[in-house]
C-alpha cells in the first residue's frame, strides 16, 4: 500500500492555551488525491493548513506528511521538508517586496536542491513558463518588483512560486481570493 500524502491522528491545536480550534480524531489523504476545505471564517481552516505545512506545531496528536511525522522534527527539519516537498500559497502571499516577479518565483529553488534539480538549468525560463500559464506574460511586468503589482497579480506570483520545482503537495489557502473571474 502506498504511504498517504497526509495522515492525522488525534490532532489538537489551541492558540495560547485557549479552547482548541482544531480537534481532528483521524484523517488521511492519499497521494494524488485533492481536497477542498470549506467553512466559515475562524473555523480553523488556515490553522489546519499551517499545521500540515509544519509552520504551526500541534498541541497533541500525530501529523505525518509524506511519511514524515512532523512532531518529531526540529524547526529546521520542518523547514527543510517544506522547502523540498511542499508548495504553499499563504493568504498573505509572503512575497519579498524588493525582489522581481521572477526572483520571487525562483526563490524556493535557493532553499531546495531537490526542487532546483527538478527545474534543471534555466530557472528563470521555468518561472516565466509558470507565470505565463497564470496569465502574466508581459516581460516588463516580470522584471518589476512585486510591490508594484496589483494584489491579483501578486497572488498569481505566489501561485507560480508554490508550483515551481514540482512539489509533491501544494497547500493553497484561499488561492483565488484576489483574482478576477477571468
Where are these regions (language model features)?
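Helix-to-loop junction immediately C-terminal to a conserved catalytic motif
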Residues: 53
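Catalytic Walker B motif of ABC-type/P-loop ATPase nucleotide-binding domains
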Residues: 170-173
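Short coil-to-helix segment of the ABC ATPase nucleotide-binding domain corresponding to the Q-loop/switch region
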Residues: 99-108
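ABC ATPase NBD coupling module
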Residues: 70-87
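Conserved ABC ATPase signature
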Residues: 145-149, 153
Amino acid at each position: 500500500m502506498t504511504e498517504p500524502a497526509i495522515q492525522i491522528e488525534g490532532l489538537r491545536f489551541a492558540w495560547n492555551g485557549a479552547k482548541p480550534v482544531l480537534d481532528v480524531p483521524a484523517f488521511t489523504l492519499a497521494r494524488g488525491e485533492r481536497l477542498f476545505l470549506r467553512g466559515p471564517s475562524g473555523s480553523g481552516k488556515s490553522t489546519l493548513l499551517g499545521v500540515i505545512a509544519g509552520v504551526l506545531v500541534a498541541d497533541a496528536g500525530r501529523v505525518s506528511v509524506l511519511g514524515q511525522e512532523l512532531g518529531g522534527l526540529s524547526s529546521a527539519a520542518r523547514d527543510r521538508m517544506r522547502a523540498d516537498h511542499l508548495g504553499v500559497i499563504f493568504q498573505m502571499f509572503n512575497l519579498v517586496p524588493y525582489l522581481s516577479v521572477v526572483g520571487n518565483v525562483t526563490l524556493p529553488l535557493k532553499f531546495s536542491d531537490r526542487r532546483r534539480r527538478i527545474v534543471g538549468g534555466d530557472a528563470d525560463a521555468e518561472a516565466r513558463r509558470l507565470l505565463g500559464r497564470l496569465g502574466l506574460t508581459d516581460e516588463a511586468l516580470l522584471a518589476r518588483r512585486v510591490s508594484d503589482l496589483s494584489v491579483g497579480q501578486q497572488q498569481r506570483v505566489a501561485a507560480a512560486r508554490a508550483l515551481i520545482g514540482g512539489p509533491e503537495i501544494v497547500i493553497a489557502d484561499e488561492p483565488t481570493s484576489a483574482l478576477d473571474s477571468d
